[in-house]
């Protein structure tokens, strides 16, 4: 891994993750960029070594998918047996987190109401909302019609009073 081509960058751990790990592990220590790069390269090489060994173990057991057990066996066969207890703890934590995520995403399924019933209830709610909207529109229409009728009556009343006032003026003119 001496070369630093674009493909090698795809196969490394993100530097931000390494920097975070270094800060958490050694909070009061300054680490040179060369040392950080060395840690990235060591981590990458370690992952390649373990994954290659786990792949061989997987192939020997005639499986197509590398399982956590294959990784644990690879650690043991490469002399990293002292890491196995921590690896198992982390594996259990990952399983717990994944289970919580699945439970959270399956809340709908855990309601105990069949999907067909939920869809029926949803359609019923939509129908009620459409009915309420139609009733509101009808009320608005009736209010507009009443307002228009009142405006017409007011205009007719004003016109009638204007005509009555002008005919009263004509009668007053006749008296002179």
Swiss-Prot record:
Pfam families: CBFD_NFYB_HMF
A single BP term in Gene Ontology: regulation of cell division
Post-translational modifications: Phosphorylation regulates its interaction with TBP. Not phosphorylated when bound to DRAP1.
Keyword field contains Phosphoprotein: yes
Record flagged with keyword Acetylation: yes
Protein's cellular compartments: Nucleus
Motif window: Nuclear localization signal: 100-103
Disulfide bond positions: none
Family as reported in the entry's similarity comment: Belongs to the NC2 beta/DR1 family.
Role description: The association of the DR1/DRAP1 heterodimer with TBP results in a functional repression of both activated and basal transcription of class II genes. This interaction precludes the formation of a transcription-competent complex by inhibiting the association of TFIIA and/or TFIIB with TBP. Can bind to DNA on its own. Component of the ATAC complex, a complex with histone acetyltransferase activity on histones H3 and H4.
Protein name (record): Protein Dr1
Species this protein is from: Mus musculus
């Amino acid at each position: 891994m001496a070369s630093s081509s674009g493909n090698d960058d795809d196969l490394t751990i993100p530097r931000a993750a390494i920097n975070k790990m270094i800060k958490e592990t050694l909070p009061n220590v300054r680490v040179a960029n060369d040392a950080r790069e060395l840690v990235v390269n060591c981590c990458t090489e370690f992952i390649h070594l373990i994954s290659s060994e786990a792949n061989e173990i997987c192939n020997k057991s005639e499986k197509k998918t590398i399982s956590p057990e294959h990784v644990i066996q690879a650690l043991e066969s490469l002399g990293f047996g002292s890491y196995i207890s921590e690896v198992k703890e982390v594996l259990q934590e990952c399983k717990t987190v994944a289970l919580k995520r699945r439970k959270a995403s399956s809340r709908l399924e855990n309601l105990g109401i069949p999907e067909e019933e939920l869809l029926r209830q949803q359609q019923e709610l939509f129908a009620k909302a459409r009915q309420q909207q139609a009733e509101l529109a009808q009320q608005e229409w009736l209010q507009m019609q009443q307002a228009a009728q009142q405006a017409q009556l007011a205009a007719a009343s004003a016109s009638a009073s204007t005509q009555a006032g002008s005919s009263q003026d004509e009668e007053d003119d006749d008296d002179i």
